[in-house]
C-alpha cells in the first residue's frame, strides 16, 4: 500500500502568492488615492472658510481686505484652518495656502487672491468679490 501525500503544488502556492501580492498593491494604491482626495477636499474647505470669513465678516465690517490673514483678524474662521494638512501656516515657505492681497494702501487692500495647490486637480483659486 502506498501513501499518497496531499498538499499544494508549488504552482498553486505561487499563484496564491501572486494573487495576494496584486490585491495588496491594488489596496495600497486605492488607499493612497483616497488619502489624496481627502487632503484636497480639506484644502478646499480651508480656502472656502477663509474666503467666506473675508467676504461675509471682515469686508462688511471694515470696507477693505487685510494685508495678511490669520486667526487674529479672521476670528470667524477656525484657527486650525490657517495651517495646511502638512502643518505649514498660510503664506510661509512650503505652505499649500497662499493669500495675495492687491491694491494695498496703509495695510488696507482692495482685492486679494486665495489659492491652494492640489495634488489631483488644478490649483483651487478664490478671488475677492469687491475689486
Q: What is the predicted role of each segment?
A:
Residues 2-31:
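N-terminal single-pass transmembrane signal-anchor helix
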Residues 17-18, 26-48:
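Aliphatic-rich helix starts adjacent to a transmembrane/signal segment
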Residues 54-86, 124, 128-131:
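Short, glycine/small-hydrophobic-rich surface segments
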Residues 94-106:
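Short, surface-exposed beta-strand/loop micro-motifs that present aromatic residues
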Residues 104-131:
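Short, surface-exposed interaction loops/tails
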Amino acid at each position: 500500500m502506498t501513501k499518497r501525500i496531499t498538499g499544494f503544488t508549488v504552482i498553486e502556492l505561487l499563484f496564491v502568492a501572486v494573487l495576494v501580492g496584486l490585491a495588496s498593491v491594488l489596496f495600497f494604491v486605492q488607499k493612497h488615492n483616497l488619502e489624496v482626495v481627502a487632503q484636497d477636499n480639506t484644502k478646499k474647505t480651508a480656502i472656502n472658510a477663509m474666503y467666506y470669513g473675508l467676504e461675509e465678516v471682515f469686508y462688511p465690517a471694515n470696507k477693505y481686505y487685510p494685508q495678511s490673514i490669520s486667526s487674529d483678524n479672521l476670528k470667524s474662521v477656525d484657527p486650525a484652518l490657517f495651517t495646511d494638512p502638512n502643518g505649514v501656516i498660510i503664506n510661509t515657505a512650503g505652505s499649500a495656502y497662499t493669500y495675495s492681497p492687491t491694491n494695498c494702501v496703509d495695510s488696507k487692500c482692495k482685492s486679494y487672491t486665495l489659492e491652494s495647490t492640489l495634488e489631483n486637480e488644478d490649483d483651487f483659486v478664490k478671488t475677492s468679490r469687491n475689486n
